[in-house]
From Swiss-Prot:
Its main location: host cell. One of its GO terms (biological process) is symbiont-mediated suppression of host innate immune response. Coiled coil: none annotated. One of its GO terms (cellular component) is host cell perinuclear region of cytoplasm. This is Non-structural protein 1. The lineage of its organism: Viruses, Riboviria, Orthornavirae, Negarnaviricota, Polyploviricotina.
Length: 256
């Protein structure tokens, strides 16, 4: 893998992040109205290592997205967008082992989150909540010391930390294309560490356009899927987003 760049656009913040993924690590730069100066791209983590993953190889692709350490604050223009961005956005062969290592000072944790932590896999709610709490206990200022999962077009984890201090461990499942639309459906589940409870499920629409992908988030109250089976595509009503959309101002816009 020779490496590639993608941009994360947030127009209302007046800027964007350019994320570079290479064989030796990742590089992040932020700039607003002005183009970045020489040397403005900094290593997100000197210890970060991504497995070699052939890009554009084969007919079947998996979409892997990791957003770690999204911290929202109002300190500066840069921090008002996000003060750190670590992630990967890759198309690769159907099964990919994707792991993070040494993302913080604590490196002794070895934590693996299941790819599909649905209720039926647990004997009771306490056991399910215990699983989430155990997984989140490994989190640090950055997210998880080590997080490993298998991406097969199924669930993959995304970490978000809001300015209110709540940790959200979001599992997203690709649920198939939406007939008659350029978008596809994902299911999401939130866990709010601050409130110590499992959050609501939501259904989201991911719009694909000429520039790339736009993630559009729905209110948690809007849920029409049975989890791992991916039946959301049968129930999705596109106007839900206009009526009940809770988005990060049209979400995160990715452009390869």
């Amino acid at each position: 893998m020779s490496g590639f760049n993608f941009e994360v656009m947030v127009p209302e913040q007046g800027g964007k992040v350019v994320f570079s993924l290479t064989e030796t690590g990742s590089c992040v730069s932020f700039y607003g109205d002005d183009e970045p100066g020489e040397g403005s791209c900094e290593l997100a983590s000197e210890n970060m290592d991504f497995p070699s993953c052939p890009l554009g190889n084969g007919d079947d692709f998996c979409l892997s997205l990791a957003l770690s350490t999204m911290r929202w604050s109002g300190m500066t223009k840069r921090n008002n967008f996000m003060d750190r961005f670590i992630g990967s956005f890759v198309h690769c062969t159907p099964v990919m082992i994707w792991s993070y290592g040494n993302l913080s000072k604590k490196s002794h944790h070895k934590m693996v989150c299941h790819t599909c932590p649905d209720e039926y896999k647990f004997s009771d709610k306490d056991e399910m909540q215990g699983y989430y709490e155990e997984c989140l206990e490994a989190s640090t200022d950055i997210f998880l010391d080590e997080l490993a999962t298998v991406v097969t077009g199924g669930f993959f984890p995304v970490g978000l930390k809001g300015s209110w201090g709540g940790w959200y461990l979001k599992y997203v499942r690709y649920a198939g294309p939406l007939a008659g639309s350029s978008g596809f459906i994902v299911n999401q589940r939130f866990y709010d560490r601050a409130q110590n409870k499992t959050g609501s499920r939501v259904v989201s629409m991911v719009e694909m356009d000429g520039d790339g992908l736009s993630f559009i988030y729905e209110k948690p109250s809007v849920y029409h899927s049975d989890g791992c089976t991916g039946s959301a595509a049968r129930f999705w009503k596109r106007d839900h987003n206009e009526r009940a959309g809770v988005e990060l101002r049209a979400g995160l816009h990715f452009r390869m």
